[in-house]
UniProtKB/Swiss-Prot annotation:
InterPro entries: FAD/NAD-bd_sf, Lycopene_cyclase_b/e. This is Capsanthin/capsorubin synthase, chromoplastic. GO terms for biological process: carotenoid biosynthetic process. Its EC number is 5.3.99.8. It is found in: Plastid, Chromoplast. Keywords: Carotenoid biosynthesis, Chromoplast, Isomerase, NAD, Oxidoreductase, Plastid, Transit peptide. Belongs to the lycopene cyclase family. NCBIfam families: carotene-cycl.
């Protein structure tokens, strides 16, 4: 869902998405919303022309006005003549890469180099988070817009009002803060694309497109979902979240300015679109909306999860029909984004010679698409594991280092919890619009401790089991029938995977 949005300066024109790895690969997600490498701002004139038709409304024909921006910041650059051997090389300067660089470089003088084709580019995606998540990790000052409440439209007759504040991340403020801390800690930067990663027993190196080779004890891949540097030994049977979003100036809109719309599952806008309505009944999409003022709003039509992925053209067509039905006339498209987020699937091989964080590490929430806040929160623990090996006099390297850092990110309890979240994703994949509505009707009736914890990946395995029992108790009879008839296969798969993890 698009919890996922995009980087602006701290002006009201910023949006929030949850892909958090490489600068050049945007993404976004609803349960943050937070998505990566999958979401991108589009200004391709040919793309818009290709799908243009008056049936879908004028906004699809409007060209986004945003252009790539760069931070005005002096970085300390890597110089080949220095012949420095680093402790850690981090590939990618998205939120995940810079957060880890900031954290690990502050521990025991660990030497870090970040490599990215454009380290000063503003992040091209938006990030949305629950305010309490950023409060817990000391980053609340990086939010430039907050809403005291969120709401979920189950259908035309039922709306859930959630007393949990939601915020939009200022991409420029967050990136500047991370860069400032990195520079203070002695992190070096290299402007290049990594072509190859090579490994020896106690040392690794990267080869860049400018011909430079840089050596380190540990390589960390934070470059996003599309990376080829991280190995998998199981089929990557992802579900996919796909969305189309626009930051738009509109003549007016119907949203309350003090409420962020987390999900709108209504489908009355498809009454005159029989094909779209029929397909939406099987593979539903919802609207995600962040109203900034009476004329500025971020709007995103999102397929929560599907396999195979829902057509992007279909998503845009549904969005156009929805906005037309709601009477929202778009005057200007300031940004638009296409978001495609792989969800669930197997974890990378653990351990392996390349460490990972962000989209390529499996951190994205399999059932929601959230990732940014979680990555920000987990980076310090991973930094501790790295520093324990490389910042001490012991200098643990090679396979013991890889084992230590991978287990620092994915300890057994976290891997087991992920199996449960993946079970949630597999369940959602089997629900049509009516089943999805029933599910979220019951889900947001749970004790806030449960639904807060589920969306923020905070619950233990025992608590997740308690959530399941409570959800079954809150569910309607029809929803219970969905659970009984559609969940056994995913449940058996989850139990088998849990058994394998604990052996």
């Amino acid at each position: 869902m698009a919890t996922l949005l995009s980087p602006f300066s701290p002006s009201p024109l910023a949006k929030v998405s949850q892909i958090i790895d490489s600068t050049s690969s945007p993404s976004f997600s609803l349960f943050p919303l937070g998505r990566q490498n999958a979401c991108s701002r589009k200004a391709d004139h040919h793309h818009h022309h290709r799908i243009r038709t008056s049936k879908f409304g004028n906004f699809l024909e409007l060209t986004p006005e945003s252009v790539p921006e760069f931070l005005d910041f002096d970085l300390p650059w890597f110089h080949p003549s220095d012949r420095i051997r680093y402790d850690v090389i981090i590939i990618g300067t998205g939120p995940a890469g810079l957060r880890l660089a900031e954290q690990v470089s502050s521990r025991h003088s660990v030497k870090v180099c970040c490599v990215d084709p454009s380290p000063l580019s503003t992040w091209p995606n938006n990030y949305g988070v629950w305010v309490d998540e950023f409060e817990d990790i000391g980053l609340v000052d990086c939010l430039d817009k907050t809403w005291p409440m969120t709401c979920v439209f189950i259908n035309d007759h039922k709306t859930k009002y959630l007393d949990r504040p939601y915020g939009r991340v200022s991409r420029n403020i967050l990136k500047t803060k991370l860069l400032e801390n990195c520079v203070s800690n002695g992190v070096k930067f290299h402007k290049a694309k990594v072509w190859h990663v090579n490994h020896q027993e106690f040392e690794s190196s990267i080869v860049c497109d400018d011909g430079n080779e840089i050596k380190a004890s540990l390589i960390v891949d934070a470059s996003g979902f599309a990376s080829s540097f991280v190995e998998y030994d199981k089929p990557r049977n992802h579900g996919y979240q796909i969305a189309h979003g626009i930051l738009a100036e509109v003549e007016s809109h119907p949203f309350d300015l003090d409420k962020m719309v987390l999900m709108d599952w209504r489908d009355s806008h498809l009454g005159n679109e029989p094909y779209l309505r029929a397909s939406n009944l099987k593979l539903p999409t919802f609207l995600y909306a962040m109203p900034f003022d009476s004329n500025l709003v971020f709007l995103e039509e999102t397929s929560l999860v599907s396999r195979p992925v829902l057509s992007y053209k279909e998503v845009k067509s549904r969005m156009a029909a929805r906005l037309r039905h709601m009477g929202i006339r778009v005057k200007r498209v300031i940004e638009d984004e296409k978001c495609l987020i792989p969800m669930g699937g197997p974890l990378p091989v653990i351990p392996q010679s390349v460490m990972a964080i962000g989209g390529t590490s499996g951190l994205i929430h399999p059932a929601t698409g959230y990732m940014v806040a979680r990555t920000m929160a987990l980076a310090p623990a991973l930094a501790d594991a790295i520093a324990e090996c490389l910042g001490s006099t012991r200098m643990i390297r090679g396979r013991p280092l890889h084992q230590k850092v991978w287990n620092g990110l994915w300890p057994i309890d976290r891997r087991c919890n992920r199996e449960f979240y993946s079970f949630g994703m597999e369940t959602l994949l089997k629900l049509d619009l009516k089943g999805t509505r029933r599910f979220f009707d019951a889900f947001f009736d749970l004790n806030p401790y449960y639904w807060h914890g589920f969306l923020s990946s905070r619950l233990s395995l025992a608590e997740l089991a308690g959530l399941s029992l409570s959800l079954f108790g809150h569910a309607s009879n029809s929803s219970r029938l969905d659970i009984v008839t559609k969940c056994p296969v995913p449940l058996v798969k989850m139990m088998g995977n849990l058994a394998l993890e604990t052996i």
